[in-house]
From Swiss-Prot:
N6-succinyllysine PTM positions: 83
GO biological process: immunological synapse formation; positive regulation of early endosome to late endosome transport; positive regulation of protein localization to early endosome; regulation of cell shape; regulation of organelle assembly; T cell aggregation; T cell migration; T cell proliferation
Listed name of the protein: Moesin
Organism, as annotated: Sus scrofa (Pig)
Modification Phosphoserine, positions: 74, 407, 527
This protein's encoding gene: MSN
Biased composition (Basic and acidic residues): 376-414, 492-518
PROSITE patterns in the record: FERM_1 (PS00660), FERM_2 (PS00661), FERM_3 (PS50057)
Residues carrying S-nitrosocysteine: 117
Record-annotated FERM domain positions: 2-295
C-alpha cells in the first residue's frame, strides 16, 4: 500500500492536518478542506503554497499535489486563502464562515499595510473587529486594558499619532460602545462593507511595462483591469471592465488583451517574468468568470444557500431578541431588588431615628417626673410651715386674750399691759407677715408643679404618638502551472453574452456616502485624530489619499472617470503613459 503524505492546511483561524495519497489531486485536497470547515462558497478560494524557488503559488486543482512544485517538507504546507474577491460583500457573501474568512484576510491585509487604510477608517474598522470578537461592551467585564492583547491598528497609524496604548483603547472603546445590540456576524459584514471601499482592497498588483518601456502597475480585480503609475497604487489612471475584453493571451513575457471592439488595437504590456504572465492569465480568467456569473440569475444552489442563510439569520435574530428580552427582565428585576433594598435601608434608618427619639423623650419624661416630685415635696414643706405659723398666730391671739383677761383680773398697771400689748401686737404682725410669705411661696411652688405636670402630660402624649407610628412591612427579596517555464504561451477566450453590458458597478457609491451613520463616525474620528497627528510622519500614500479627498474622489468616482471614452482612446492613453 502506498505511503501516505502528511499535509497541513492553515486557514485564517484554524490549522488542519490531513494524510493524502501520492495520487491525490489538488481538487481532492481542496474538497477535503472545504468539507472540514463547512464552506460552500468555494469559488472564491484556493490553496496557496511556497514553491522550491520561494515564490507564493496557487495549487492547480486538476493536477496531483505531488506533481506540483511544492517544497518537499513534512508535512506539506498550504494556506487556504481567498483568491478572488466579490464586487459587493453584502450581496455575494452568503455564509457566515465565508464572511468571517474574508474578514480575517482583509483585516490582516490592512494591519500589515498591504491594503492602505486612512487612520480614521482604521479606528472605525477596529471597533467593528472588537464588536465581532467581544460582542456588546460591558463595563463590568471589559475593564481597562481589555484590548491590550489585540492588534487592531496598522503600525503606520500608531506611529503617526502622539497617543499611547491607553488613549488608543479609549478611542476604540467609545466606538465599540456605539455598536451595542449588533450581532457579531453583522459586525463582520459592516467591517467588510467599509473595507471594500478602500482603493487597494481586492486588487492584485503586477509590475509591467507598456511598449514605450514605462514602468507601470497592472491591477487585476473583480471589476476588470486597471493601469496605475509606478508611484501611485491608490489611483488607477485607465480602466478596462471585463465586459470589454474578448481574449487574453501571452507569449513569453508579452501579454496581449484583445478588446471586443474590433476597431480598437490590442492592449499589450510586458511582464518581468513568464510566471507572472501565467498568474495574470489565471486571475483574469477566474475574475472574468465570476464577473459574468454575477450578472446572471442565481443558480439553484446559490438560491438555496441564500434561503438557508436568511433562515439562519432570522433564527439568530429571534434568539438575540429573546436573549435581549431576558436580559432586560433580569436588569429590571435587579433594579427592583436594589430599590427594595434601598427602601428597606431607609425604613431601618427611620426606625432607628424613631427609637432614638423615643429614648430621648423617655429620658425627658423621667427628668420631668423627678422635678415634679421635688417641687411637690417643696410645696408640702412650705404648706407645713404655713400651718405651723398659723397655729403660732392662733396661740398668740389666745395669749393676747389671756393677757387682756389677766389685766382685768389682776388689775395690772396700764403701762405694763400697754407694753406687753405692744410686744404681742408686734409679734402678731411679724407672724402674719411670715405666714403671708410662706403662703406666697407655697402658691409659687404650686404653680411650678402645675407647669411641670403639664409638660409631663405633653411628653407622655408625644411618646404615645411616636410608639404608635407604623414602621412598614419587611420588603420581599428578589480555490497553466506557474512553475513550468517551458510553456511560454497560452490563450483564453473570455466569453461574453447579453449580460456583458451590465456595468452597474460604475453606479456604486461608498458605504460612507450612503450610510449617514458611518459618514458621521468617520467625520468625528477625522476631527478627533487631527490634534494628535504628527504631520512629519505622513507617507506617500497618506498624501495621495489626502489629495484624492480634497478633489472629492473615491474608488467608484475614479472608476467611472478612468473608463470614460471608447476602448481605443483608453488603449492609446495607456501607450502614451
Amino acid at each position: 500500500m502506498p505511503k501516505t503524505i502528511n499535509v497541513r492546511v492553515t486557514t485564517m483561524d484554524a490549522e488542519l492536518e490531513f494524510a493524502i495519497q501520492p495520487n491525490t489531486t489538488g481538487k481532492q485536497l481542496f474538497d477535503q478542506v472545504v468539507k472540514t470547515i463547512g464552506l460552500r462558497e468555494v469559488w472564491f478560494f484556493g490553496l496557496q503554497y511556497q514553491d522550491t524557488k520561494g515564490f507564493s503559488t496557487w495549487l492547480k486543482l486538476n493536477k496531483k499535489v505531488t506533481a506540483q512544485d511544492v517544497r518537499k517538507e513534512s508535512p506539506l504546507l498550504f494556506k487556504f486563502r481567498a483568491k478572488f474577491y466579490p464586487e459587493d460583500v453584502s450581496e455575494e457573501l452568503i455564509q457566515d464562515i465565508t464572511q468571517r474568512l474574508f474578514f480575517l484576510q482583509v483585516k490582516e491585509g490592512i494591519l500589515n499595510d498591504d491594503i492602505y487604510c486612512p487612520p480614521e477608517t482604521a479606528v472605525l474598522l477596529a471597533s467593528y473587529a472588537v464588536q465581532s470578537k467581544y460582542g456588546d461592551f460591558n463595563k463590568e467585564v471589559h475593564k481597562s486594558g481589555y484590548l491590550a492583547g489585540d492588534k487592531l491598528l496598522p503600525q503606520r497609524v500608531l506611529e503617526q499619532h502622539k497617543l499611547n496604548k491607553d488613549q488608543w483603547e479609549e478611542r476604540i472603546q467609545v466606538w465599540h460602545e456605539e455598536h451595542r445590540g449588533m450581532l457579531r456576524e453583522d459586525a463582520v459584514l459592516e467591517y467588510l462593507k467599509i473595507a471594500q471601499d478602500l482603493e487597494m482592497y481586492g486588487v492584485n498588483y503586477f509590475s509591467s511595462k507598456n511598449k514605450k518601456g514605462s514602468e507601470l502597475w497592472l491591477g487585476v480585480d473583480a471589476l476588470g483591469l486597471n493601469i496605475y503609475e509606478q508611484n501611485d497604487r491608490l489611483t488607477p489612471k485607465i480602466g478596462f471592465p471585463w465586459s470589454e475584453i474578448r481574449n487574453i493571451s501571452f507569449n513569453d513575457k508579452k501579454f496581449v488583451i484583445k478588446p471586443i471592439d474590433k476597431k480598437a488595437p490590442d492592449f499589450v504590456f510586458y511582464a518581468p517574468r513568464l510566471r507572472i504572465n501565467k498568474r495574470i492569465l489565471a486571475l483574469c480568467m477566474g475574475n472574468h468568470e465570476l464577473y459574468m456569473r454575477r450578472r446572471k440569475p442565481d443558480t439553484i444552489e446559490v438560491q438555496q444557500m441564500k434561503a438557508q442563510a436568511r433562515e439562519e439569520k432570522h433564527q439568530k435574530q429571534m434568539e438575540r431578541a429573546l436573549l435581549e428580552n431576558e436580559k432586560k427582565k433580569r436588569e429590571m428585576a435587579e433594579k427592583e431588588k436594589e430599590k427594595i433594598e434601598r427602601e428597606k435601608e431607609e425604613l431601618m434608618e427611620r426606625l432607628k431615628q424613631i427609637e432614638e427619639q423615643t429614648k430621648k423623650a423617655q429620658q425627658e419624661l423621667e427628668e420631668q417626673t423627678r422635678r415634679a416630685l421635688a417641687l411637690e415635696q417643696e410645696r408640702k414643706r412650705a404648706q407645713s410651715e404655713a400651718e405651723k405659723l398659723a397655729k403660732e398666730r392662733q396661740e398668740a391671739e389666745e395669749a393676747k386674750e389671756a393677757l387682756l383677761k389677766a389685766s382685768r383680773d389682776q388689775k395690772k398697771t396700764q403701762e405694763q399691759l400697754a407694753l406687753e400689748m405692744a410686744e404681742l401686737t408686734a409679734r402678731i404682725s411679724q407672724l402674719e407677715m411670715a405666714r403671708q410669705k410662706k403662703e406666697s411661696e407655697a402658691a409659687e411652688w404650686q404653680q411650678k408643679a402645675q407647669m411641670v405636670q403639664e409638660d409631663l402630660e405633653k411628653t407622655r402624649a408625644e411618646l404615645k404618638t411616636a410608639m404608635s407610628t407604623p414602621h412598614g412591612a419587611e420588603p420581599a427579596e428578589n480555490d497553466q502551472d506557474e512553475q513550468d517555464e517551458n510553456g511560454a504561451e497560452a490563450s483564453a477566450d473570455l466569453r461574453a453574452d447579453a449580460m456583458a453590458k451590465d456595468r452597474s458597478e460604475e453606479e456604486r457609491t461608498t458605504e460612507a456616502e450612503k450610510n449617514e451613520r458611518v459618514q458621521k463616525h468617520l467625520k468625528a474620528l477625522t476631527s478627533e485624530l487631527a490634534n494628535a497627528r504628527d504631520e512629519s510622519k505622513k507617507t506617500a500614500n497618506d498624501m495621495i489619499h489626502a489629495e484624492n479627498m480634497r478633489l472629492g474622489r473615491d474608488k467608484y468616482k475614479t472608476l467611472r472617470q478612468i473608463r470614460q471614452g471608447n476602448t481605443k482612446q483608453r488603449i492609446d492613453e495607456f501607450e502614451s503613459m
